Structures are given as structure tokens and as C-alpha cells.
């Protein structure tokens, strides 16, 4: 089945190579009175449009026309391989569904001892990657045709390293403790938290 609409406002910048704020208005079929749409656009839109943004849309359309098919074929292949690589995560989980926009990578923290906010903070601070949204027990990452192999590798590496840290923290409670000097602590898991005082009270 093909879903149709009379008018669609399409944000170009979300998934295509175009500047933020750029969008297109699509009109379909004969129900929409195109002259009325043009009339209201002239009444409501700015008399000083951003030519930088409009040029960005033009460049995007040119890219799609000349290179779009080949670029999207590469993107789909990269995305599929990336999603397959995430199948071995032990605590974080890639959310999959039958009817689903595969370009949106949703990572669930439902079975992990970390919150979605903590995962977002770790991704930002340790790996300098920007998730699209944090909510409930998941984190959303947007991908696009502009993403490189290196970009997918960075996100995959970040998720696996965080996933491994979660496993380590969990296992720290069941492993046998072993006293060690602080200088030998690198690469080991602390049995308890270490705090600096003052200020505050232990």
C-alpha cells in the first residue's frame, strides 16, 4: 500500500545534505488548489528570504539528481552492516521492528544498569557524538546519506565500549575483591566509589 497526502511539508535537513531550517512543500493530486497555496504563501512568508538556505536546497536537489541513486545505495549498505554489527551488544539493545525507518538507530537501555540520560552524556563527553533525542529508556541516533564509514565505526565503537563498561560494573559486585595499591589501579574495577574531601562530609 502507498500512503498519500494532499500536502506534505518535508524537512530536507533531517536526512539530506542541506542546511538546518530548509524544507520543501509538496503538493499531490487535484484536491489542492495550487493558486490558493501560492497566494497564501505570498501573504505569510518572509519578503526577505534567506538565499543561503535556498541555495542549500538547490545544491541538495542537484546532488540527488546527479549522485543520489549511487549515494543512497552506498548509504543503505553501510547502514545495514552497521545495524548487523550491533547485534552482539549484551546490555544495550538495538530496537528493531517490521515497519520502521531504518535510518533511525534506537538504542534501548531497558536491560542495562544505565539510564538513557547517562548514555547520552557518555556518548557526548567521551566520544563527541551527538544523539538526536533522549527519552524514557532509549536514545535515538539519526543517520543520513552524508554519514561516512568512519562515522558509523565511531558510533559502533562507542556503543560497544560503553556496553563493556556496563558489564564490568555489574560483575564488580560478584567478583572476589583483591587489595591493590592505587598506582596499580589502571584497567581494574574499583570495588567501591572513591571521593575527594573536603568540601562536603564523607
Task: Name each region found by the language model.
Residues 2-3, 15-19, 33, 64, ...:
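Solvent-exposed alpha-helices and their adjacent loops that cap or buttress functional pockets
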Residues 3, 11, 26, 40, ...:
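Generic, well-ordered alpha-helical scaffold segments in large soluble proteins
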Residues 3-37, 46-56:
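Active-site PLP attachment segment
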Residues 10-14, 43-50, 68-75, 108-113, ...:
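Hydrophobic alpha-helical scaffolding
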Residues 14-15, 30-32, 59-60, 110-112, ...:
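Short, glycine-/Ser/Thr-/acidic-enriched flexible segments
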Residues 55-70, 146-150:
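Amphipathic alpha-helix from the class-I
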Residues 61, 65-97, 117:
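Conserved PLP-dependent catalytic core of the aminotransferase class-I/II
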Residues 87-202:
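Conserved C-terminal alpha-helix-loop-beta "cap" of PLP-dependent enzymes
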Amino acid at each position: 500500500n502507498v500512503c498519500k497526502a494532499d500536502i506534505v511539508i518535508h524537512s530536507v535537513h533531517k536526512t539530506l545534505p542541506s542546511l538546518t531550517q530548509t524544507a520543501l512543500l509538496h503538493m499531490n493530486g487535484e484536491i489542492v488548489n495550487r493558486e490558493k497555496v501560492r497566494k497564501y504563501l505570498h501573504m505569510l512568508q518572509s519578503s526577505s528570504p534567506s538565499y543561503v538556505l535556498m541555495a542549500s536546497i538547490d545544491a541538495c536537489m542537484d546532488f540527488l539528481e546527479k549522485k543520489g541513486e549511487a549515494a543512497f545505495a552506498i548509504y543503505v549498505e553501510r547502514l545495514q552492516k552497521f545495524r548487523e554489527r550491533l547485534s552482539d551488544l549484551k546490555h544495550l539493545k538495538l530496537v528493531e521492528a517490521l515497519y520502521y525507518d531504518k535510518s533511525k538507530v534506537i538504542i534501548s537501555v531497558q536491560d542495562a544498569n544505565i539510564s538513557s540520560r547517562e548514555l547520552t552524556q557518555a556518548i557526548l563527553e567521551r566520544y563527541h557524538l551527538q544523539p538526536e533525542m533522549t527519552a524514557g529508556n532509549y536514545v535515538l541516533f539519526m543517520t543520513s546519506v552524508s554519514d561516512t564509514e568512519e562515522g558509523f565505526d565511531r558510533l559502533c565503537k562507542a556503543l560497544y565500549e560503553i556496553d563493556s563498561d556496563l558489564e564490568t560494573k555489574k560483575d564488580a559486585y560478584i567478583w572476589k575483591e583483591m587489595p591493590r595499591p592505587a598506582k596499580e589501579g589502571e584497567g581494574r574495577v574499583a570495588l567501591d566509589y572513591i571521593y575527594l574531601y573536603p568540601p562536603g562530609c564523607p
